[in-house]
């Protein structure tokens, strides 16, 4: 029966991709690579100096604009809610009653352009920028990266999306 074969194929694929995701991370207890990156608003962010050294837990969403599961996760607003309620006091989009202990970044780690992030081209399902209150970092060649995707490689990203939590 074709339906049973499709179910078995789906289960097999899910299992394979699940095991792949187990290896798409830095080992627990390891020290996350430091970075100094500039967001779409020309603000420079230093992971340790600006955030973890000051006590912030940092969430980093590595995604690709063409990735359907990335888009679904982004539009679930999970990280937006975290940022609005726990982000740095005084940052745009952060509630005045924030716990002031979290920072969130979105990194387009596959070398796609800001135009793609804005919803045009690259197979993107929509506009990633509008309504995103936390910093968005584009890693295409025009943003100063000699090797687009190098930050994703440094962070051992082998699939999209990959979300890291970096603790102080």
Segments from the language model and where they lie:
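Well-ordered, non-membrane alpha-helical segments in soluble/globular domains
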Residues: 73-90, 117-123
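Loop/turn elements at helix/coil->beta-strand transitions in domains of secreted/extracellular proteins
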Residues: 53-59, 98-104, 131-135, 159-161, ...
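Thiol-based oxidoreductase modules, predominantly thioredoxin-like and allied folds used
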Residues: 87-118, 131-146
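Boundary/junction segments of secreted and surface-exposed precursor proteins
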Residues: 23-32, 135
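Conserved redox-active cysteine motifs that mediate thiol-disulfide chemistry
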Residues: 57, 62-81, 113-114
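Bacterial Sec-dependent N-terminal signal peptides
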Residues: 1-27
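A short beta-strand-turn-helix
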Residues: 35-58, 81-93
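Thiol/disulfide oxidoreductase modules built on the thioredoxin-like
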Residues: 52, 141-168
């Amino acid at each position: 029966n074709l339906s049973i074969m499709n179910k078995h194929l789906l289960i097999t694929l899910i299992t394979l991709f699940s095991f792949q995701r187990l290896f798409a991370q830095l080992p627990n207890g390891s020290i996350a690579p430091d970075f100094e990156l500039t967001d779409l608003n020309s603000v420079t962010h230093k992971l340790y100096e600006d955030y973890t050294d000051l006590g912030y837990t940092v969430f980093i969403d590595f995604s690709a604009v063409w990735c359907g599961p990335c888009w679904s996760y982004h539009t679930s607003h999970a990280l937006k809610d975290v940022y609005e309620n726990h982000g740095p006091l005084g940052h745009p989009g952060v509630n005045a009653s924030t716990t002031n202990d979290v920072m969130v970044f979105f990194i387009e780690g596959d070398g796609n352009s800001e135009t793609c992030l804005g919803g045009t081209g690259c197979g993107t399902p929509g506009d990633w920028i509008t309504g995103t209150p936390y910093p968005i970092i584009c890693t295409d060649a025009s943003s100063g990266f000699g090797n687009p995707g190098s930050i994703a490689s440094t962070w051992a990203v082998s699939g999209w999306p990959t979300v890291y939590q970096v603790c102080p």
